[in-house]
């Protein structure tokens, strides 16, 4: 008759096949393959079994949000819902620190957003919320890009640093390749 359904109607073999399918991309003795996969989740539920399984396998994921798109913010990337497990290997320390600070500011703002919008937040109550309020417009401007806008990596990094109130300082990569292997 076949396999019995397990998680939300998906059979166990689906979850067994995902790593084999997704890990075909990668490095081998013959070269490397980069894969960009698209996963449409049921009802925008990021904890849906397939989405959850795929996120656990991949080195990172970019979450697109209908809510952000409805605000005419493009690309409609949910930064707080997106993750890169290799970022520390490919950016320098100042870039990594700025990206982490931006995520923290966005998270603080998201936590307090309802209070801010209804006027219940009193300025000075929390230095973290005050900093997030001060920088959120610059962060959102940094995260918006016109469909025809082309920005170099260097310009993007400069704008990221400016969005969180930092200046560029040349530094070493956040992690040396040997450090990255030891960390995994």
Where do the protein language model's features map onto the residues?
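P-loop NTPase catalytic core
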Residues: 1-184
């Amino acid at each position: 008759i076949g396999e019995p359904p397990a998680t939300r109607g998906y059979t166990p073999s689906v979850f067994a096949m995902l790593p084999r399918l997704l890990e075909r991309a990668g490095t081998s003795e013959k070269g490397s393959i980069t894969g960009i996969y698209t996963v449409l989740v049921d009802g925008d539920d990021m904890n849906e079994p397939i989405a959850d399984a795929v996120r656990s396998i991949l080195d990172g994921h970019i979450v697109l949000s209908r809510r952000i798109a409805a605000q005419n913010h493009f690309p409609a990337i949910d930064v707080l819902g997106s993750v890169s497990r290799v970022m520390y290997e490919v950016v320098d320390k100042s870039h990594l620190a700025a990206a982490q600070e931006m995520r923290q500011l966005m998270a603080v703002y998201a936590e307090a957003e309802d209070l801010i919008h209804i006027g219940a937040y009193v300025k000075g109550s929390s230095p973290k919320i005050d900093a997030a309020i001060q920088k959120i417009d610059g962060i959102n401007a940094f995260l918006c890009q016109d469909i025809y806008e082309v920005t170099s990596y260097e310009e993007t990094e400069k704008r990221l640093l400016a969005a969180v109130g930092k200046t560029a300082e040349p530094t070493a990569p956040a992690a040396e390749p040997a450090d990255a292997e030891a960390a995994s």
